[in-house]
Amino acid sequence: MILSTQAAGVVSPLGAVTPLSLTGRVSMLFRSAASALGSVFPFGRPGRGLIAGARDDTTTALPRGTQGIRKVAILGIHGWYPRKALRTVIGEPTGTSQKFCDEMDLALKEYLDQHQKILDPQDIVKIPLEGEGKVLERVELLYQNLVRNHAWRRAVQEADLVLVATHSQGTPTSILLMARLIEEGILRVREDDPAMQRIGILTMAGISHGPFPFLKGMFIVRWFEAEAARELFEFMDSESHIARKYRDGLRTVLSSGVRMTCVASLEDQVVPLYSAVMTSIHHPSIVRAVYIDGTSYQNDFLINLIAFSLRLRNMGVDDHGILVHLSEVMAGALYGEGHSTIYDEREVYMLSIRSLLEPPASLTSERSRSEPILNPFRAKQRLNPFYLPWGMRGIADEIMARGDQILIKELERVKRLYNDWNPVSKAMKEIKFRLEPVRSKL
């Protein structure tokens, strides 16, 4: 089932639930969720997922869509290559670059078919880039692999549409690689260039702000894994050398008009929600979403609060740190599959295509090429539990000050869900207890 909006908030596979279709075959539960969280885009493919989130309802999508698309280059870039001991946690990287290319290719063809546009097979070139190591080592290796392959380089240079799909450690690797391609003129991003390319990057469970801090001292990481794994924790501090390099790359990419879709996995056992959605980075060309495993989906207060917070970020409204403070409690079991199952969901790829080809009218050229705001960030082992109600109060005050009736109604709905919420686990009960003082503000 897929419920989608211009800027997405929630992605969840729903197992045997009948997918949404033009005939309206969907449970009332999800009709309600769709109505509350945004517009509905039906898809014909029986899927595992639901995408619900936000759009700026005062705007409409720009009409360009598939116009001018004659050639496409799809780059797939896998994440960190773990040793055997951790592959059940991280997932198998070998072949995932090809999988990302294949899934993006299928999603694109489905999208083009919906818009009565057909490209010849040779006009879509898939470029699976593979190579291990630390981030900067990988950037150099993948760059050389790309430019030395004349067919791949030509495909990238001649493409009207460039799509990138990446996962985990592949996120900073991809951003730095794309920044280099932009700086060297291999990618054409100048507005005065009649052959300017449209470029979209899909990051899945990206490790932009590092893994969960509590993983740093784990025996399995310290003993079995080497420099590439330890480097991931350097992203927890925005002042580290590699984090500064990454932010320079983000600045280049986002100010060049590249559209980014950042999808987290709700029960990720490695990458926290705030890290995957780049919570400290602010730019109108970033669309944020979260993937929820079907067995974990509940239409309750917490899920809707996360979706609501993502909706705010997608509309350019501050979430007042809520996503950071909800991330730890949503961590998946260490040997679960939340970190790797995200890239099996086709609609995650479809979301990134829609985000690129159907931007809101409010995303003007000037805004899409503005400098990103890169707030300092440092992950903490322990968070102040009393910050959560202040964050919620901040959201409520900002929404009321804006006077946005759509958001005010959303806030009222969140309050009703809070009142009806009867959490079972200790962690969820603690969240409800912490938010009790701010109930009246909601």
What annotation goes with each model-predicted range?
Residues 136-248, 254, 270, 277:
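Serine-dependent carboxylesterase/thioesterase catalytic core
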Residues 114-120, 192-194, 253:
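Short, conserved catalytic or adaptor-binding loops enriched in Gly and charged residues
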Residues 9-46, 64-162, 204-231:
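Active-site catalytic motif of lipid deacylating hydrolases and related acyltransferases
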Residues 72-76, 121-129, 201, 260-262, ...:
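Conserved beta-strand scaffold positions in the cores of enzyme catalytic domains, especially
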Residues 57-63, 192-195:
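Intrinsically disordered, low-complexity acidic Ser/Thr-rich regulatory segments
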Residues 1-61, 232-234, 241-255, 259, ...:
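Extended, polar/charged low-complexity intrinsically disordered and coiled-coil segments in eukaryotic
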Residues 109, 144-151, 179-182, 353, ...:
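Alpha-helical repeat scaffolds in large eukaryotic proteins
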Residues 96-100, 104, 135-138, 142, ...:
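Alpha-helical interaction elements in eukaryotic regulators
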